[in-house]
From Swiss-Prot:
<dbReference type="GO" id="GO:0000287">
    <property type="term" value="F:magnesium ion binding"/>
</dbReference>
<dbReference type="GO" id="GO:0016984">
    <property type="term" value="F:ribulose-bisphosphate carboxylase activity"/>
</dbReference>
<feature type="binding site">
    <location>
        <position position="305"/>
    </location>
    <ligand>
        <name>substrate</name>
    </ligand>
</feature>
<feature type="active site" description="Proton acceptor">
    <location>
        <position position="153"/>
    </location>
</feature>
<keyword id="KW-0503">Monooxygenase</keyword>
<feature type="modified residue" description="N6-carboxylysine">
    <location>
        <position position="179"/>
    </location>
</feature>
<comment type="similarity">
    <text>Belongs to the RuBisCO large chain family. Type I subfamily.</text>
</comment>
<comment type="subunit">
    <text>Heterohexadecamer of 8 large chains and 8 small chains; disulfide-linked. The disulfide link is formed within the large subunit homodimers.</text>
</comment>
<dbReference type="InterPro" id="IPR017443">
    <property type="entry name" value="RuBisCO_lsu_fd_N"/>
</dbReference>
<feature type="binding site">
    <location>
        <position position="273"/>
    </location>
    <ligand>
        <name>substrate</name>
    </ligand>
</feature>
<keyword id="KW-0602">Photosynthesis</keyword>
<dbReference type="InterPro" id="IPR000685">
    <property type="entry name" value="RuBisCO_lsu_C"/>
</dbReference>
<feature type="binding site" description="via carbamate group">
    <location>
        <position position="179"/>
    </location>
    <ligand>
        <name>Mg(2+)</name>
    </ligand>
</feature>
<comment type="function">
    <text>RuBisCO catalyzes two reactions: the carboxylation of D-ribulose 1,5-bisphosphate, the primary event in carbon dioxide fixation, as well as the oxidative fragmentation of the pentose substrate in the photorespiration process. Both reactions occur simultaneously and in competition at the same active site.</text>
</comment>
<feature type="binding site">
    <location>
        <position position="181"/>
    </location>
    <ligand>
        <name>Mg(2+)</name>
    </ligand>
</feature>
<keyword id="KW-0460">Magnesium</keyword>
<feature type="binding site">
    <location>
        <position position="151"/>
    </location>
    <ligand>
        <name>substrate</name>
    </ligand>
</feature>
Length: 414
């Protein structure tokens, strides 16, 4: 009863595209029905309480199955979920339902969630990015070019004072942002409060000398939500413009709580995707990053790391640009060549700035400005701090290269 090819999807349905590999001997229709059942109202047997509700109203429906070209025994199963199955404004509940139990199902050898269509009726119940791209540009007074960042290295082991010195040199050299590495929380060699204080001093000194607004992504991620909020509050009291969160290791509930605080208190929110490859790297099993990106846009974040296409971390060009559009744009058409299975309408939800980071350096600048355009953050860690003349010259090199590439694009020279 969960495989219903005659079903006409509604504008209010959440639609999911699963790449499924059934066990040998299990028909695709049976596997698709099992996915729809286990991720909605079904269980392993008929229960007498089924008669106390309207399963027809609440069940997920597998409404289409198509074989994957070039793959043996692999199918895309399309499942529609009625909106009443989900709590409003909760990414946690949405993912618990759709990907909670079904991935361990015996009838399947592998299962991957490739895409979700979030209807406006549901997306409008979420906070979304605390500020969004345009508000961030207005806050920073920076327009017409990608923003430049740098992750402070070595990621672990620096004292707070030396860390602050590196921040100052990079910002003084021309970068817009510096960043805590995702590993940096509050360790014995550098407690969070000391780091925040030295970084704030570096920020204000660099701002005074350059006349530009500067930021450092102060990582508020912590072992408890209460401690995370305490760090965000201290960052705001210091006058820092932006904080950071590891949204997958920290969790969506914590992330949305922090996003609400950031919106109410004028803080930008930078999101790191540490742990994403555990979930999204296998081609046949897990969750594609485009789904994690959509979930983040709803949960709340102004920046998120989105791969580079050209650096040390994996990322296919067309697929990467597909989820970059899903992060930034209001309306994204279905385009299977870019891995986009459904047309997505975000209506008025603000966009998220994609961050290119990981093994990139100044020689990648022409490709990065062409691929990501103006509305992006290009982040060079080793590509700044690895400059043979030091941190500040590394920052100068990146700023000069960025402005040269933007000028070339504007003048039609490329």
């Amino acid at each position: 009863t969960y495989y219903t090819p005659e079903y006409q999807t509604k504008d209010t349905d959440i639609l999911a595209a699963f790449r499924m590999t059934p066990q040998p001997g299990v028909p695709a229709e049976e596997a698709g029905a099992a996915v729809a059942a286990e991720s909605s109202t079904g269980t392993w047997t008929t229960v007498w309480t089924d008669g106390l509700t309207s399963l027809d109203r609440y069940k997920g429906r597998c409404y289409d199955i198509e074989p994957v070209a070039g793959e043996e025994n692999q199918y895309i199963a399309y499942v529609a979920y009625p909106l009443d199955l989900f709590e409003e404004g909760s990414v946690t509940n949405m993912l618990t339902s759709i990907v909670g139990n079904v991935f361990g199902f015996k009838a399947l050898r592998a299962l991957r969630l490739e895409d979700l269509r979030i209807p406006p009726a549901y997306s409008k119940t979420f906070i979304g990015p605390p500020h969004g791209i345009q508000v961030e540009r207005d806050k920073l007074n920076k327009y017409g070019r990608p923003l430049l960042g740098c992750t402070i290295k070595p990621k672990l082991g620096l004292s707070a004072k030396n860390y602050g010195r590196a921040v100052y040199e990079c910002l003084r050299g021309g970068l817009d942002f510096t960043k805590d590495d995702e590993n940096v929380n509050s360790q014995p060699f550098m407690r969070w409060r000391d780091r925040f204080l030295f970084v704030a001093e570096a920020l204000f000194k660099a701002q005074a000398e350059t006349g530009e607004i500067k930021g450092h992504y102060l990582n508020a991620t912590a072992g408890t939500c209460e401690e995370m909020m305490k760090r965000a509050v201290f960052a705001r009291e210091l006058g820092a413009p932006i904080v950071m969160h590891d949204y997958l290791t920290g969790g969506f509930t914590a992330n949305t709580s922090l996003a609400y605080y950031c919106r109410d208190n004028g803080l930008l929110l930078h999101i790191h995707r540490a742990m994403h490859a555990v979930i999204d790297r296998q081609r046949n099993h897990g969750i594609h990053f485009r789904v994690l990106a959509k979930a983040l846009r709803m949960s709340g974040g102004d920046h998120i790391h989105a791969g580079t296409v050209v650096g040390k971390l994996e990322g296919e060009r067309e697929v990467t640009l597909g989820f970059v559009d899903l992060l930034r744009d209001d309306y994204i058409e279905k385009d299977r060549s870019r891995g986009i299975y459904f047309t997505q309408d975000w209506v008025s939800m603000p966009g998220v700035l994609p961050v290119a980071s990981g093994g990139i350096h100044v020689w990648h600048m022409p490709a990065l400005t062409e691929i990501f355009g103006d509305d992006s953050v290009l982040q060079f860690g080793g590509g700044t701090l690895g400059h043979p003349w030091g941190n500040a010259p590394g920052a100068v090199a990146n700023r000069v290269a960025s402005e040269a590439c933007v000028q070339a694009l504007n003048e039609g020279l490329r």
